[in-house]
Amino acid sequence: MNKKIEKFLNDNKIKYEVILHKKVFTAIDKAATLKIKQKLSGKTLVLRADKDFVVALIPANKNLNKDALKKTINFLRKKLGNTAIKKIDFASETQIKKVFKGAKTGAVVPFGVVWRKVLFVDKSFLKEKAIFINSGDYFQSLKISPKIFQKLPDCFLGSFSKAR
């Protein structure tokens, strides 16, 4: 696991379990490998919101509803007195490598604050006791309580996933 992530978890007293597994690149593969339901496997998405980057976490069995996420972002920006974003799209691998230094594409950890980025978490995770998220490595995942997202700085909950 990335030392920066490990330090963040420990400094914030976040309880986690490292789960070792075969090499996986997607949240769906992670669910199959760990023999868990796809709704328990977190899919980390890096998006470009106009000129800013944000991180979103949704269940593996869902797709991102960009319009709903855009509304969530704009609601937050309005509360903070900022202008609304006009466009939201997935970041390219090149952008991810440049902005999220040390992160591996396909294994980005959903703790945006580590890179000074805002994290948006689909609130459907709050129904679960534990979820499995990226650790920053293709060979391991983190088992955590989704309740921690309610306490993290620069983390916002919303409904922005849709059925595949």
Enumerate the language-model features and the residues they cover.
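Extended, low-hydrophobicity, polar/charged segments
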Residues: 1-164
